[in-house]
A protein has these predicted regions:
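Topogenic membrane-insertion module of multi-pass membrane proteins
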Residues: 1-55, 237, 256
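Multi-pass membrane catalytic core of lipid/isoprenoid biosynthesis enzymes
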Residues: 14-21, 63-121, 153-154
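C-terminal membrane-associated helical module and adjoining short loops/tails
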Residues: 1-5, 135-256
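C-terminal ends of transmembrane helices
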Residues: 59-68, 115-133, 183-192, 239-242
């Protein structure tokens, strides 16, 4: 019997991370409901909140020592809905439904590629040979980041009020591009591998505080900035990964 389970059932400590994951799932579905009603800002806010909760559940599970196979499966299913299905439907309702034939196909591509990315992650989680992970990188764009990037046209529309950003042609092309990034084999930075120098800690904390304030005061400009920064980091991550692999190759050559 699992140590978290006794004759009286499962402990509250074991349920907390799963409750957070379930709440993230609810936020994703709520985003779709808000999108159906045309409440675009609130719809995006629900998906963003789902992303925050998704970032917390695993860390809280490790902190409480409450990791479980059930929690991992629930997290994957929640991510698929909150960052694949829900963003695809929101983009379709906001713009892609105006495409004569291919708008729904683009929305499907985003949802399906998110599912495929998560399936690949689950299939490789126990694999012995994972070059990207061993070097501190993700493989492809993670699902929450992919959802945030897919919403860039909506950020631009909310910031500028320009309906050109809502035209289905560029939105469809952008949606397909993000779908491809999610299932790509490109190395991308993993937050768990980022280390901050001791003498930069206070600056980092101040930056996080300012970022939080910016998200409250000017959320769409801030999210647009963060999404653009993430896009710029993709080629940097690729170059950094190549350097790591070259150093490893040189070290193996010296060892021989």
């Amino acid at each position: 019997m699992n140590e978290e389970e006794g004759p009286r059932g499962i402990s509250l400590r074991a349920m907390i991370p799963n409750a957070i994951t379930t709440l993230a799932l609810c936020m994703g579905l709520t985003g779709v409901s808000l999108g159906v009603r045309g409440e675009w800002e609130r719809a995006l806010g629900a998906i963003i909140l789902a992303g925050v909760l998704d970032g917390l559940d695993g860390r809280i599970a490790r902190l409480l020592r409450a990791q479980s196979k059930f929690g991992a499966e629930l997290d994957s299913l929640s991510d698929n809905i909150a960052f694949g299905t829900a963003p695809a439907l929101i983009l379709f309702l906001w713009s892609l439904q105006m495409a004569p034939r291919f708008g729904w196909i683009a929305a499907l591509a985003l949802a399906v590629c998110c599912a495929l990315r998560l399936a690949r992650f689950n299939a490789l989680i126990d694999a012995a040979e994972q070059p990207h992970k061993s070097a501190g990188f993700n493989t492809g764009v993670p699902a929450p980041a992919g959802a945030g990037l897919a919403f860039i046209p909506i950020y631009l529309w909310l910031v500028t009020g320009n309906d050109h950003f809502r035209a289905w042609q560029p939105v469809m092309a952008w949606t397909l591009f993000i779908a491809a990034l999610m299932i790509s084999s490109l190395p991308t930075y993993s937050w768990s591998s980022i280390r901050i120098r001791r003498d930069w800690r206070l600056f980092a904390l101040a930056g996080i505080a300012l970022l939080g304030a910016s998200l409250i005061v000017t959320p769409w400009i801030t999210l647009l900035f963060l999404a653009g920064l993430y896009l710029l980091m993709i080629p940097l991550a690729f170059a950094s990964y190549q350097r790591v692999m070259r150093r490893r190759g040189a070290a193996r050559a010296r060892g021989q």
